[in-house]
Design a protein with these regions (language model features):
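Mobile, glycine-rich extracellular loop/lid and propeptide segments
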Residues: 1, 14, 194
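N-terminal Sec/SRP start-transfer signal
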Residues: 1-11
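Alpha-helical transmembrane segments
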Residues: 12-42, 46, 50
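Basic-flanked hydrophobic alpha-helices used for secretion and membrane insertion
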Residues: 33, 45, 49-357
């Protein structure tokens, strides 16, 4: 009996250890998936050799021109010739570290039967330098472009020009370097759906549907409120004007909470960027009408509706959340925008004759 009892304890111990091991391995695997969903491996059209860039910042990592040489023919970096200014290669080192990636060939390979990367990857996503032209139409008939949104650019944010400072850079970093409330959802919904709880409505099912993404605390930014029309955009315009004129900025202090049904069903307008051009028969060129307020007002009015059909928030049990707070539209909208552009007369003419203006 003692032997049998001891043996049963041994089996129980082994079972417990095995269960713990399996649980720990599953937890580690889940953490790895969650982390990679937030920080995926990205291959861009161009890259830079960081080691070359970093080494250019120190004298030991660069080649100086005009320095004396020792008897072995090596540069003497202990000091230059008195009365002479030597050269430290900085920009040339940086440029030599730049590389260009052939993404067209890479995509062909990934889509071919030769590639086995898809077997080991959760998803392969493609992004394009295409941004849907989205407008908000207010009750008074005025229109405001909300994507791409140039509001923060007016404040000197999101740029690296002479007006940018460490303060604006810090602000942009805190906003995730995103100067627009709108952004595209990953094409593979399995990457993010399990990380979020649907608080109202549903996830987008059509190209012209979008979802409001809350922070883990259930909040949206005041910037998003202006984009959605829940706060008067004239208030924001006034702050920008005061800032531009170096005046004291009147910042609103009162903000209220919003019910889900106040966000649900909000509509925006999609405009085909090709439609902002009209052909001039007299000069035989395409002219932009983007600055013509009456033309743009009519164009926006005739645009397709983009509707918020859901509100989501990070699940409190999720170890990571890959979406940022704002308004997310499906990848199918980007595909629609590209197709509509390809079908336009101006693009067809330019494809047939690149010299077309």
């Amino acid at each position: 009996p003692l032997t049998a009892f001891a043996g049963s304890i041994g089996f129980i111990g082994i079972a417990l250890i095995f269960s713990l091991s399996t649980g720990v391995n599953a937890y580690i695997a889940d953490m790895e998936r969650s982390t990679l969903s937030e920080y995926p491996l990205q291959i861009l059209s161009s890259g830079v050799d960081i080691t070359s860039f970093l080494s250019s910042g120190s004298s030991g990592g660069t080649t100086a021109t005009g320095l004396p040489t020792d008897e072995d023919g090596k540069k003497d970096t202990s000091g230059g010739v008195e009365g002479m200014v030597s050269v430290r290669q900085l920009i040339t080192k940086m440029v030599s570290g730049l590389t260009s990636n052939d993404l067209t060939s890479l995509k062909k390979y990934l889509d071919s039967d030769e590639s086995t990367i898809a077997d080991d990857a959760t998803s392969i996503e493609y992004s394009y330098s295409v941004s849907p032209q989205i407008y908000r139409q207010d009750a008074d008939g005025s229109v405001h472009q909300v994507n791409p949104d140039s509001t923060l650019s007016m404040l000197g944010l999101g740029s690296s020009g002479p007006g940018s400072t460490s303060v604006t850079s810090s602000l942009m970093n805190s906003m995730g370097s995103n100067t627009s409330v709108f952004y595209q959802l990953p094409a593979n919904s399995a990457l993010y759906k399990s990380q979020y709880e649907v608080k109202a409505g549903r996830w987008p099912e059509k190209p012209t549907e979008c979802v409001a993404v809350l922070s883990k605390y259930g909040t949206v930014t005041d910037y998003a409120l202006y984009s959605m029309g829940l706060r008067d955009s004239a208030e924001l315009d006034k702050m920008i004007q005061q800032f531009a004129q170096n005046q004291n900025v009147d910042v609103p202090s009162e903000f209220r909470s919003y019910r889900y049904d106040e966000l649900m069903g909000l509509k925006f307008k999609l405009v085909n960027s090709a439609d902002t051009y009209v052909y001039d028969d007299t000069y035989g060129i395409w002219k932009s009408k983007a600055d013509d307020k009456d033309y743009m007002k009519q164009l926006v009015e005739n645009g397709e509706d983009i509707t918020i059909v859901g509100i989501v928030q990070p699940d409190y049990t999720a170890s990571a959340s890959m979406l940022t707070s704002g308004i997310a539209y499906p990848a199918s909208l980007t595909e629609k925008v590209m197709k509509d552009a390809a079908d336009s007369d101006i693009v067809k003419q330019q494809m047939a004759d690149p010299a077309t203006n």
